[in-house]
């Protein structure tokens, strides 16, 4: 008998035997088997069969438990294993006879249930009492099988295979579970046209990730439900197949193929009533092929696809289609391509407006129309690595989620007041132990203060709860209204006009009036509210900023003032280069005011001048101004790119070369942080081909890396530095205008015209004057003073000492760098020796003064170093 049992039948009989041992029963009865069938894992086929004859599962289980409890039990250490009772043998014999009658090769759990109903004695009576007679069960069993025979050891997993391995999208549309699909009429019409063909009626939707391929299929499901399709598709079921579920748990070779064959047979038996949908269609190529087998899912589908027996809609991305589907021409020719293009910003706004109600109901917040417009436009401009409408929908969803989190969290006023109350309570406990008069008086004052704050806290908390209730009330009403509209639509579709009229002319208008009243009440509360209840354009901009680091929101008053004073801020670090500071400041202001060219970098400059005059320092100061960190910039030393083959390191090695997967040093840095300062230092030392790469960046604000990805440079400030012609700038015999002209001539002879023509500005840094060196000396001294302050040392430097530093450190050919070295050697080195020797201790004041042609460094008490 074992050889004829299916896997689940064997498991059920073993479980029944174990139950008999546990209960101490000498006989294995049909009641044990019935309980095992009801309580086993993956027993949905048994429960579905009993549900089909409207039997009460709980009552059947209770009846079987009662029978088992009434059986005689045997105790002792030498109890023999339970033996099948006469009734049990009769049940198995009846099950075998029924299996033979139905032409089945294996004995399944359904056969055993039929045997219990027919020959199970008391257990059969329990089933009969619940309306599950052998005759009714056999009819339900035949209907569920659909004419298929049991020819494998796992037939139970094959019944209702389509239901098990698929999701009915038309049922979801009927229940209002799918989001509305706005637009995409042309794509849906093309899909319907292909599905209406006689053969090869299989459209495949191809497009970039996030453009709405799955939404097109959901739109088709909604049209089928509404009847807005040709006769050939009316009343059809659109089922999304889950290949992952088919593969999951397929332990043995051929198990996946068996499941897929069962699904395909069920689709074929439906006589064209089922249209299938496979998302990520490329997964069918290679799915299920194990070892040396060539029979993957794609090859199993081909015959039915070609004959028109299987109407299938696929969806995949352009890259996956090219890599997987096009490599199998026999599979490709069975599908008809439907290209789903990225919608425009205007179309995306329309889509967002259609989805707005769903997101408002889910998050229980209001979403302003300006937020939808901002989501579409800002995502299109700043999130270039993804596609509309998906990225815009994500922005709205996350902004609404943030606001909901803020609403559910305590407002700042309540939080601060609660902390204050907690502090006063702790203080009260501490002072309460004191008995002196001063402490008692302080305790009295503290308790009065605590009572006032607790009363204020109660008032604020009550107000906050009221505001939250008002917000939640509006959200709940919107959700209920959405649900009732769905019910009304279903009632109209099903011809239940009585229910539809009750909803449309009774409940829905009442609910709309309640919603209007609740919204008005909310507006009253909102005039002086503690919590914000509407997602606005600024919230969307905040999400964009958190994703990309790009400040896309409106300028706050403090930031406006900061930008207007940008020259002063940069001038605190960069001495004497007014033209360069103004050029960079103007570029940043254009960008933040929103009037910069959106298709070019924020600014691109070539800084020219002798060494040590502040070219690199200005780039650092700019990064510090924008990001509060001078290291927050992409700095590339172009002397490392002096050879032709090293150019590929900027954008990444081409395919087949070492480092292909790593990406380029320039492109990867900007891709990770699109709003940044890019400093290309000493560009004249780079190979000429580097400038050919930069042409695209300077003109269109984009660059394609070694892996074919387009990197967006439109939010970067590009700074290139060079020493070309610096010998003219330090020549004291020529005027300023002539110096600059000579430098520009050298630059024009060194760089191609098309490169120079794309730069926003060529900024010539002038040599530093004596006065400017004095100011730089003060900056260097201030830096040293800050480092000494960490050791609680105070540094005092006289004006005479500063003048000496400026004189001694003045070398026009080398700029301010000799001055930095002089401060380090003349002051820093001496201080280091004395600190280590203990001559200067923490808390001392150090004085630096000039004595003749020397610098005197010593404690303020007068001792020199």
UniProtKB/Swiss-Prot annotation:
The keyword Coiled coil applies. Residues 559-767 are annotated as: NBD2. Residues 84-147 are annotated as: Repeat 2. SUPFAM superfamilies: Double Clp-N motif, P-loop containing nucleoside triphosphate hydrolases. Residues 393-527 form a coiled coil. PANTHER family: ATP-DEPENDENT CLP PROTEASE (PTHR11638), HEAT SHOCK PROTEIN 104 (PTHR11638:SF18). The Clp repeat (R) domain probably functions as a substrate-discriminating domain, recruiting aggregated proteins to the ClpB hexamer and/or stabilizing bound proteins. The NBD2 domain is responsible for oligomerization, whereas the NBD1 domain stabilizes the hexamer probably in an ATP-dependent manner. The movement of the coiled-coil domain is essential for ClpB ability to rescue proteins from an aggregated state, probably by pulling apart large aggregated proteins, which are bound between the coiled-coils motifs of adjacent ClpB subunits in the functional hexamer. This is Chaperone protein ClpB. It comes from Streptomyces coelicolor (strain ATCC BAA-471 / A3(2) / M145). The lineage of its organism: Bacteria, Bacillati, Actinomycetota, Actinomycetes, Kitasatosporales. The gene is clpB.
């Amino acid at each position: 008998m074992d050889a004829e049992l299916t896997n689940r039948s064997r498991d059920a009989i073993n479980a029944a035997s174990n139950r008999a041992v546990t209960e101490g029963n000498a006989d294995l009865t049909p009641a044990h088997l019935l309980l095992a069938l009801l309580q086993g894992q993956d027993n949905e086929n048994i429960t579905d069969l009993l549900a089909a004859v409207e039997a009460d599962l709980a009552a059947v289980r209770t009846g079987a438990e009662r029978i088992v409890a009434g059986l005689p039990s045997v105790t002792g250490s030498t109890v023999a294993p339970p033996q099948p009772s006469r009734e049990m043998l009769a049940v198995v014999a009846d099950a075998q006879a029924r299996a033979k009658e139905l032409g089945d090769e294996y004995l399944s759990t359904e056969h055993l249930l039929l045997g219990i109903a027919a020959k199970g004695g008391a257990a059969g009576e329990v089933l009969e009492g619940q309306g599950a007679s052998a005759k009714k069960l056999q009819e339900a069993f035949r209907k569920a099988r659909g004419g298929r025979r049991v020819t494998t050891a796992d037939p139970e997993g094959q019944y209702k295979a389509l239901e098990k391995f698929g999701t009915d999208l038309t049922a979801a549309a009927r229940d209002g579970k799918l989001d509305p699909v706005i637009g995409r009429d042309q794509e849906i019409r093309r899909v319907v046209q292909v599905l209406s063909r006689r053969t090869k009626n299989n459209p495949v939707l191809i497009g970039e990730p996030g453009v709405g391929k799955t939404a097109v299929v959901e739109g088709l499901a909604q049209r089928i439900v509404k009847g807005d399709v040709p006769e050939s598709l009316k009343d059809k079921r659109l089922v999304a197949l889950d290949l992952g579920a088919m593969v999951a748990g397929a332990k043995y070779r051929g198990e996946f193929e068996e499941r897929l064959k069962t699904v395909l047979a069920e689709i074929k038996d439906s006589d064209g009533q089922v249209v299938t949908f496979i998302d990520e269609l490329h997964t069918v190529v290679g799915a299920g092929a194990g070892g040396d087998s060539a029979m993957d899912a794609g090859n199993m589908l081909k015959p039915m696809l070609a004959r028109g027996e299987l109407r299938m809609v696929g969806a995949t991305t352009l890259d996956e289609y090219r890599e997987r589907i096009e490599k199998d021409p026999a599979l490709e020719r069975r599908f008809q391509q439907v290209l789903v293009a990225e919608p425009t910003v205007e179309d995306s706004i329309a889509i967002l407006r259609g989805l707005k109600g769903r997101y408002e109901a889910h998050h229980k917040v209001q979403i302003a129309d300006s937020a939808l417009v901002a989501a579409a436009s800002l995502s299109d401009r700043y999130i270039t690595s993804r596609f509309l409408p998906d990225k815009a929908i994500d922005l709205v969803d996350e902004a609404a989620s943030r606001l909901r989190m803020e609403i559910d969290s305590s407002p700042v006023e309540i939080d601060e007041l609660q902390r204050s109350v907690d502090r006063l309570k702790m203080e009260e406990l501490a002072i309460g132990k004191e008995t002196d008069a001063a402490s008692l008086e302080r305790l009295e004052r503290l308790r009065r203060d605590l009572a006032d704050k607790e009363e204020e806290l109660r008032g604020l908390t009550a107000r906050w709860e009221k505001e939250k209730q008002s917000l939640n009330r509006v959200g709940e009403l919107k959700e209920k209204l959405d649900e009732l509209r769905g019910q009304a639509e279903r009632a109209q579709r099903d011809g239940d006009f009585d229910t539809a009229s009750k909803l449309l002319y009774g409940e829905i208008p009442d609910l709309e009036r309640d919603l209007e009243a609740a919204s008005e009440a909310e507006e009253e509360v909102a005039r002086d509210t503690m919590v914000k209840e509407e997602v606005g354009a600024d919230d969307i901009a905040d999400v964009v900023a958190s994703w990309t680091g790009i400040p896309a929101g409106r300028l706050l008053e403090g930031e406006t003032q900061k930008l207007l004073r940008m020259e002063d801020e940069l001038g605190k670090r960069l001495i004497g280069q007014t033209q360069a500071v103004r050029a960079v400041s103007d570029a940043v202001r254009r960008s933040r005011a929103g009037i910069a060219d959106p298709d070019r970098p924020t600014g691109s400059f070539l800084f020219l001048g002798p060494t040590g005059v502040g070219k690199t320092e200005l780039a650092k100061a700019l990064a510090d101004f924008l990001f509060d960190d001078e290291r927050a910039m992409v700095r590339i030393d172009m002397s490392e790119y002096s050879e032709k083959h090293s150019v590929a390191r900027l954008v990444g090695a081409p395919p087949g070369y070492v480092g292909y997967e790593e990406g380029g040093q320039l492109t990867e840095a900007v891709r990770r942080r699109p709003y940044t300062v890019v400093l290309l230092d000493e560009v004249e030392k780079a190979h000429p081909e580097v400038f050919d790469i930069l042409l695209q960046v300077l003109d269109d604000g984009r660059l394609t890396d070694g892996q074919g990805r387009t990197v967006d440079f439109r939010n970067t400030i590009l700074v290139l530095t060079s020493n070309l012609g610096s010998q003219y700038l330090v020549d004291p015999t020529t005027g300023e205008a002539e110096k600059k002209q000579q430098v520009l001539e050298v630059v024009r002879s060194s760089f191609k015209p098309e490169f120079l023509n794309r730069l926003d500005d060529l900024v010539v840094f002038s040599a530093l004057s004596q006065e400017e060196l004095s100011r730089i000396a003060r900056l260097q001294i201030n830096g040293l003073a800050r480092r000494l302050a960490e050791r609680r040392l105070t540094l005092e430097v006289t004006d005479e000492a500063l003048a000496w530093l400026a004189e001694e450190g003045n070398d026009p050919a080398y700029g301010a760098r000799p001055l930095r070295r002089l401060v380090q050697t003349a002051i820093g080195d001496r201080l280091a020796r004395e600190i280590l020797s203990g001559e200067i201790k923490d808390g001392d004041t150090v004085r630096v003064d000039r004595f003749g042609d020397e610098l005197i460094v010593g404690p303020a008490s007068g001792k020199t170093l």
